[in-house]
């Protein structure tokens, strides 16, 4: 009984390590203006604004919606700020969609961002906590042991991660917005890059980017007001589980599997590899592609790496289920926005609007985001056709 | 005279905020004991799993953990990574090993350093024991344990990690 | 539009300092209280969970993640979080119910403001380029606002003291209050200024604690066979961040939200207003168009104890309590966020 909603406008900023030409307000406004232009709408056409970003500590601005309301044309309107750790870009899109799907709003603007150059994310992620051992491990230090366990269980060859690192950067080279532009990247170059947290090498890890991503989501009755084809929202789901508990399956978290099952059920998907045309999946460390291929049901347990090695997820190799044609998190990573970029890029695909990284004839796409200790998941399925 | 004056496009605005931090009641009980050199876990009354360091609740059941269980300082490597990035104010030099270790008698792992080992020989299932700092350096912190080092005991099979009693792997 | 009902509410005592209690230990008793009120066990028994908190109060990123440990989130649950007062977590939950993806939701908020120096921490909410480096604390900003009100003859210091005295007296009936008691206007006015024209008594006493609420569809409330109050209207609006560009003596966003929420569509027997400062209660009551028939802050409001990140939810909870107890049949609750009432939420509650 949810109101049908669609993405009618998408706006992003060029992702770079440092946007020294704009303030935080300028950065989010740029994405918002791009989204409005894409939807052929003005500020007055927006009923509410929903923003999201990663921890406030990244930029040191407490509750930034308070400061950003003017930049986002939100004065006199409702404003909400979502924060669900790394999945925030995705969950913000879901909360924004719920504004319309609940029937309470007709058209909303949603923006996510991170201006990492004005912050110290490594510090914020690893602030010494009193009474705890200070390991300065960061995200890599947390995920590397889990990846190692996946490698042990699946007996995957050592270079699966390397292959993903190359594939996603080659995809990114097709995307003018991508932070990393590495059209000449090779397997050898990745293999020889410095090992940071074994088995994660420098070139197998995501960059740190400044950037913002915005979308306009409208109710069915208003969709025709925007000239470009819409991306109909066919399924929305989120799941959380505790960071740690006895017997927790960390390699393929239950929350991810449950979230995928929920969103597939809503979208009428029974075989994700066949039913979906492409996917934008949150892969910040290369090995997470084979791991998520299994977690999301694209490959049987233990065989995600085979799918990767076969080239099935590569646009350049003509794979049947391209993943992260935009370049993914491995090519651009403004943390608070990364989840929404996945959702937005999935929408671009089914609108036929993904430029040089378009999957020919894409009709149904998955957007995926995760955060925390791989414990928060947000996913959506968007389609060119109404359900 | 300097002809080239760069536009100012940003300013550094340091933010210093002081906080009083509390670990919480359950962690505080754990910390008082670790100051005495004793490792204690807390057991969930419903699922019976032992958590160390305890945080006050069993995350799976959502209820307070109360029962204290004294644990030995021997553990098993559940997973690990070799880190190239140094730790500020810590003499340990990269590349070093950080590992998720499960103490005998506990059912979850915690993260800590490993040392006195050949990084390439660290493996899942390996047995380790705590190397404590000198007694006079002990405080309310997990890093009373400087690191864990490998000990000469048989490896724990992967499917048994996290299920051992306080007495370790039975022979 | 689907009706949403409140079926349970609980709030911790407002403590000057929660002492050695971490997030999990603060939240769990309130969650257990609301589950018990309805006859549930843990988060598995509701369809959605949403919380409100602010990392900077505790000085640790991801404070809310710790809260997930209090829920019993195995198997995984549908859960979300706003970095705002839990009144906005309630709002997000209402959207979830109205789109048909949940029949019930658990909402909670918590804060340990005592860990840091709150008024200084809140200065970092301000524009990071122009204002935050000036470290203008939240009390000073409120004092600016109070000064404007006084200078324009819109309130007197006596009016402000009357708000304080009334709230403290009302708080005598509030078992969770941090500050309560009879105090004369003269005693209050004799206090020296803290940040003039604000006296210490004009500032709501900040408290550590947590609050929780369960909401659901009317059908679900009937299935659970528990008394409930209807949320017949809810809306929130934000104003410009630039203090010089809005009228600090009025709350335009509160008036807007009140209009959409339908405040004037019936009698307002009780209004619980989240006013962190005494003069702000007056601004809010005028913006809501409240008359002499409305009892304002019978719980004592935030003046009894300001649970950061949960006070807004508590105002809604206090109105809920008075409806299900039969004291009233219609009331208004308000929540605020940001400097000088920048962002305001208004909810109208009615008996079934």
Where are the language model's segments positioned?
Chain C
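Generic N-terminal amphipathic, Lys/Arg-enriched alpha-helix
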Residues: 3-19
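Flexible glycine-/small-residue-enriched beta->alpha junction loops
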Residues: 105-153
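Flexible, glycine/charged-enriched surface loops at secondary-structure junctions
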Residues: 42-45, 155-161, 174-180, 227-228, ...
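N-terminal leader/propeptide and maturation segments of large enzyme subunits in energy/redox metabolism
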Residues: 136-184
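N-terminal glycine-rich anion-binding loops that anchor highly charged ligand groups
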Residues: 1-8, 33-47, 55-69
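Claisen-condensing/thiolase-fold acyl-transfer catalytic domains that form or cleave C-C bonds
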Residues: 21-24, 28-29, 53-106, 110-111, ...
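Phosphate/pyrophosphate-binding loops at sites that engage ATP/ADP/AMP, CoA/4′-phosphopantetheine
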Residues: 32-47, 149-156, 222, 257-269, ...
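Short catalytic helix/loop segments, enriched in acidic residues and glycine
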Residues: 18-40
């Amino acid at each position: 009984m949810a109101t049908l909603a669609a993405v009618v406008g998408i706006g992003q900023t060029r992702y770079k390590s440092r946007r020294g030409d704009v303030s935080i307000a300028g950065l989010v406004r740029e994405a918002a203006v791009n989204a409005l232009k894409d939807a052929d709408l003005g500020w007055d056409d927006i009923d509410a604004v929903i923003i999201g970003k990663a921890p406030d500590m990244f930029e040191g601005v407490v509750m930034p919606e308070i400061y950003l309301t003017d930049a986002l044309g939100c004065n006199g309107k409702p404003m909400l700020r979502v924060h669900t750790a790394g999945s925030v870009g995705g969950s913000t899109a879901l909360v924004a969609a719920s504004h319309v799907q609940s029937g309470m709003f007709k058209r909303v603007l949603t923006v996510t961002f991170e201006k990492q150059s004005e912050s110290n994310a490594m510090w914020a992620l690893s602030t010494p906590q009193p009474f705890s051992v200070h390991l300065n491990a960061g995200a890599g230090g947390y995920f590397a042991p889990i990846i190692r366990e996946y490698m042990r269980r699946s007996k995957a060859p050592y270079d699966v991660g390397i292959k993903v690192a190359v594939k996603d950067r080659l995809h990114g080279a097709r995307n003018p917005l991508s932070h990393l532009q590495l059209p000449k990247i090779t397997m050898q170059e990745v293999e020889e890059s410095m090992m940071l947290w074994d088995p994660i090498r420098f070139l197998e890890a995501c960059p740190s980017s400044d950037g913002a991503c915005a979308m306009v989501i409208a109710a069915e009755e208003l969709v025709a007001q925007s000239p470009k084809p819409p991306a109909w929202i066919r399924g929305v789901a989120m799941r959380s589980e505790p960071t740690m508990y006895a017997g927790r399956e960390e390699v393929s978290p239950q929350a991810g599997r449950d979230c995928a099952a929920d969103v597939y059920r809503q979208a009428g998907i029974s075989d994700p590899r066949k039913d979906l045309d492409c996917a934008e999946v949150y892969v910040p460390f290369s090995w997470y592609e084979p791991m998520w291929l299994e977690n999301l049901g694209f490959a049987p347990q233990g065989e995600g790496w085979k799918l990767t090695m076969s080239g099935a997820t590569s646009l350049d190799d003509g794979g049947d289920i391209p993943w992260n044609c935009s370049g993914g998190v491995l090519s651009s990573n403004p943390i608070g926005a990364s989840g929404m970029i996945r959702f937005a890029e999935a929408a671009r695909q089914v609108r036929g609007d993904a430029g040089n990284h378009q999957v020919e004839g894409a009709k149904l796409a998955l957007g995926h985001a995760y955060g925390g200790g791989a414990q928060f998941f947000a996913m959506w399925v968007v389609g060119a056709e109404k359900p | 005279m300097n002809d080239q004056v760069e536009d100012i496009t940003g300013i550094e605005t340091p933010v210093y905020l002081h906080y009083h931090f509390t670990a919480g009641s359950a962690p505080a009980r754990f910390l008082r004991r670790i100051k005495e050199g004793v490792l204690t876990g807390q057991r969930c009354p419903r699922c019976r799993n032992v958590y160390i360091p305890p945080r006050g609740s069993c995350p799976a059941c959502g209820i307070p953990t109360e029962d204290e269980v004294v644990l030995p300082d021997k553990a098993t490597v559940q997973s690990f990574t070799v880190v190239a990035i140094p730790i500020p104010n810590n003499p340990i030099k990269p590349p070093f090993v950080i590992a998720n270790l499960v103490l005998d008698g506990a059912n979850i792992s915690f993260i800590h350093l490993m040392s006195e080992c050949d990084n390439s020989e660290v493996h899942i299932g390996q047995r380790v024991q705590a190397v404590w700092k000198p007694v006079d350096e002990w405080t309310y912190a997990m890093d009373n344990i400087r690191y864990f080092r490998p000990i000469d005991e048989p490896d724990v099979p992967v499917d048994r990690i996290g299920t051992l009693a306080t007495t370790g792997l039975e022979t | 539009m689907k009706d949403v009902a409140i079926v349970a509410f609980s709030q911790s005592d407002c403590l000057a300092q929660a002492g050695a209690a971490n997030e999990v230990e603060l939240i769990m008793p309130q969650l257990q209280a609301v589950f018990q009120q309805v006859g549930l066990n843990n988060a598995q028994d509701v369809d959605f969970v949403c919380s409100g908190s602010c990392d900077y109060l505790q000085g640790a990123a991801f404070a809310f993640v710790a809260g997930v440990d209090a829920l019993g989130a195995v198997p995984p649950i549908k859960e979300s979080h706003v970095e705002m007062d839990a009144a906005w977590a309630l709002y997000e939950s209402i959207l979830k119910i109205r789109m048909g993806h949940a029949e019930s939701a658990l909402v909670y908020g918590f804060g340990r403001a005592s860990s840091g120096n709150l008024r200084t921490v809140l200065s970092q909410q301000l524009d990071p380029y122009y204002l935050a480096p000036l470290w203008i604390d939240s009390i000073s900003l409120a004092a600016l606002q109070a000064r404007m009100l006084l200078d324009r003859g819109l309130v007197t210091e006596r009016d402000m003291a009357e708000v304080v005295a009334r709230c403290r007296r009302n708080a005598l009936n509030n078992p969770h209050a941090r500050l309560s008691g009879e105090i004369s206007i003269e005693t209050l006015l004799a206090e020296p200024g803290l940040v003039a024209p604000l006296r210490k008594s004009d500032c709501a006493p900040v408290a550590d604690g947590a609050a929780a609420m369960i909401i659901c569809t009317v059908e679900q409330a009937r299935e659970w066979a528990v008394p409930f109050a209807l949320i017949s209207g809810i809306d929130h609006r934000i104003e410009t961040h630039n203090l010089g560009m809005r009228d600090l003596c009025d709350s335009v966003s509160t008036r807007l939200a009140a209009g959409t929420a339908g405040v004037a569509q019936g009698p307002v027997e009780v209004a619980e207003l989240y006013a962190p400062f005494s003069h702000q209660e007056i601004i809010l009551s005028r913006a809501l168009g409240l008359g002499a028939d409305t009892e304002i802050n019978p719980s004592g409001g935030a003046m009894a104890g300001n649970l950061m990140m949960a006070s807004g939810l508590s105002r809604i909870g206090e109105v809920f309590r008075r409806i299900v107890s039969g004291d009233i049949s219609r009331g208004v609750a308000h929540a605020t966020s940001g400097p000088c009432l920048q962002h305001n939420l208004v909810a109208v509650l009615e008996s079934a």
